[in-house]
């Protein structure tokens, strides 16, 4: 079956770079005359007849990200792109664009599967009992041939501190929890250690400028490795483990997801899906991050252990804040934007929330008092 891949860069200046990377990256892996790769700046035209749509957008670009981090830090709270004030600010300007894209897909490709990039994971040779939200989950069991080997891992300090989460949290704290939390929980467990850290937002902005000056597969790979090496660098003293850098990235998992749907090949992946009855602390419509069974019918959550008791309050609070962010983004009202920021546990202040909205160059002009 012939396949057409249409890339839709957000800026015309990105087209040449995208073409160059795809052309070289192919390297003969695609069957000759079976895959056609094109680029377009017309989203509606690109969507027509699509079976799958991959969405990976950063509204406001890296300039927006740098502002997310620097404004939050300047107001005395954590300056990080994903969690806290930075994550809320990113959501406030992204939701309207995502809704517009969804509407256009419903018109031009109503039968398409839409895969939105978050941070999915693949299960290989083991069953991972993992539950939570995006960037806020707990690994509570690792089952190999029917046996949970997580207790053995927690008892072995050397092995436990040989990977990223073990180095980040330390063996003693992980044993106290009886689970391995997602690395982003570090921002909640040790707020005082990270709130004083420098913002990383300016680094990828400069890095991107270098890449688009002379795009190539080599510079693309170098850019990717630099990004992985420096991510959450403020939380650790050592270099990131090479195993974490060579995993292929979540783009590989997204392709596995597409393949499972297209070929009806049953696959289990950790994905963000509607909760239904999976986690008892959340309602059926809440989006959760859990192991999911994927086939031609899509992805369905699999029954897993519940969120640890100590995590229930945080999970429910962040889900409330997530919905407040969506409401603010759609309404465009300053009061709702302030509320969304103030409700986040890493902000937890109405006065600071107001300062962030007024000081943020990507928010102040949009969220004005009504």
Predicted segments with their positions:
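Glycine-rich phosphate-binding loop and adjoining beta1-alpha1-beta2 segment
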Residues: 1-32
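Residues at the starts of beta-strands that form the adenosine-phosphate
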Residues: 2, 36, 113
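Structural motif
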Residues: 6, 40, 117-118
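Flexible loop/turn segments at secondary-structure boundaries
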Residues: 11-14, 47, 62, 122-125, ...
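Short acidic low-complexity segments
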Residues: 36-49
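N-terminal Rossmann-like NAD(P) cofactor-binding module of classical short-chain dehydrogenase/reductase
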Residues: 47-57
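Rossmann-fold NAD(P)-binding glycine/threonine-rich loop
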Residues: 59-128
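Long, compositionally biased stretches enriched for glycine and/or charged residues
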Residues: 126-370
């Amino acid at each position: 079956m012939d396949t057409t891949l249409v890339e839709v860069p957000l800026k015309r200046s990105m087209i040449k770079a995208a073409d160059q990377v795809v052309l070289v990256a192919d390297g003969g892996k695609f069957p000759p005359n079976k895959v056609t790769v094109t680029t377009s700046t017309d989203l509606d035209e690109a969507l027509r007849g699509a079976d799958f749509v991959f969405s990976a957008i950063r509204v406001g670009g890296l300039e927006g990200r740098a502002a997310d981090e620097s404004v939050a830090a300047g107001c005395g709270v954590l300056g990080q792109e994903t969690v806290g004030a930075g994550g809320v600010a990113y959501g406030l300007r992204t939701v309207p664009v995502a809704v517009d894209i969804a509407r256009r897909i419903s018109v031009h490709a109503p039968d398409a599967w839409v895969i939105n990039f978050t941070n999915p994971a693949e299960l290989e040779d083991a069953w991972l009992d993992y539950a939570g939200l995006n960037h806020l989950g707990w690994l509570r069991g690792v089952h190999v041939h029917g046996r949970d080997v997580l207790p053995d891992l927690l008892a072995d300090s050397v092995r436990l501190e040989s990977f990223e989460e073990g180095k980040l949290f330390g063996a003693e704290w992980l044993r106290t929890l009886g689970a391995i939390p997602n690395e982003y929980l570090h921002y909640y467990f040790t707020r005082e250690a990270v709130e004083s850290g420098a913002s990383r937002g300016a680094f990828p902005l400069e890095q991107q400028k270098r890449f688009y000056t002379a795009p190539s597969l080599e510079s693309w790979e170098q850019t990717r490795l630099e990004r992985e090496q420096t991510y959450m660098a403020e939380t650790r003293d050592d270099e990131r483990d090479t195993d974490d850098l060579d995993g292929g990235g979540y783009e590989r998992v997204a392709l596995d997801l597409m393949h499972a749907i297209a070929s009806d090949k049953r696959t289990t992946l950790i994905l963000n899906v509607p909760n239904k009855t999976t986690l008892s602390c959340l309602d059926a419509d809440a989006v959760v991050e859990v192991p999911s069974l994927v086939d031609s019918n899509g992805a369905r959550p699999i029954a897993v252990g519940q969120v640890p008791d100590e995590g229930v309050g945080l999970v429910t609070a962040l889900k409330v804040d997530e919905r407040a962010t969506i409401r603010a983004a759609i309404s465009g009202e300053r009061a709702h934007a302030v509320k969304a920021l103030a409700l986040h546990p890493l902000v937890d202040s109405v006065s600071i929330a107001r300062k962030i909205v007024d000081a943020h160059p990507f928010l102040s002009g949009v969220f004005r008092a009504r």
